[in-house]
Amino acid sequence: LKRALWRKKQRREAEPSNTLDDLLARVDFRDAEPVVIEMATQRHVADTLYEAKMECVGQDKDAYLYYILLRYPGRTLVFVNAIDGVRRLVPLLTLLGIPAYPLHGQLQQQQRLKNLDRFRRAPHAALLATDVAARGIDIQGVDHVVHFQVPRSADTYVHRAGRTARAGREGVSIALIEPSELRLWRAIWQALERQDTVPTMPVEYTFLTPIRDR
């Protein structure tokens, strides 16, 4: 992971960039002193973030998530597109021995704060969250982000991935992609105007097979 992060940083430093001042210098304004309001959305992730993907069939996603949580211990923020998914995964992971806590809009505020506190205090745990519930909440100490489903937009992807690799720390973002989501995934990457490709996370299949059986 460290070698991959170093190569990513080298590519980012070598890429030319157009600043707002450069673009404004090319525009012929009628007003000598135009008022400029910048409304661009931040679509860059941290240089210390390692991004990867895992392609699998939909019925194997649970097993792949469990594999990630066992293979890469730490605090993992798992984004799910719907509340029903959170409600299904939390008891499943708990049954498998993974401390798992829900975060979604139908929880009382007190329960959300309690789950966040439990997640922060645990050295190894999973926080299952919807995008709406996670917005505006400062979740510190996240080691990994898992996109259990491909996000619906490029901005959502950046927002999710930005929950790790903060303040100079290293972090990992892994997208679980089933065949029906490949088109959306490619559209997100195109919208981000990223030239690099996302590497496929290596999977130890000898380790994954018994997980499927569970």
Question: Residue locations for each model-derived region?
Answer:
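Switch/connector loops and helix/strand junctions flanking conserved nucleotide-binding motifs
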Residues: K2-R3, A46-D47, R87-R88, Q110-R112, ...
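Amphipathic alpha-helical interaction motifs in eukaryotic regulatory proteins
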Residues: Y50, Y66-L70, V90, T94, ...
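Short, surface-exposed amphipathic charged segments that create phosphate/polyanion-binding patches used
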Residues: T48-K53, R118, I211-R214
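Short acidic active-site motifs
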Residues: Y64, Q111-N115, A133
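Arginine-glycine-biased low-complexity disordered regions
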Residues: W6-D21, L70-P73, L95, S153-A154, ...
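Interdomain coupling/hinge region of P-loop NTPase helicase/AAA+ cores
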Residues: L1-L107, M201-Y205
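Conserved RecA-like helicase motor core of SF1/SF2 enzymes
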Residues: G97-P99, H104-Q109, R121-A125, T130-L184
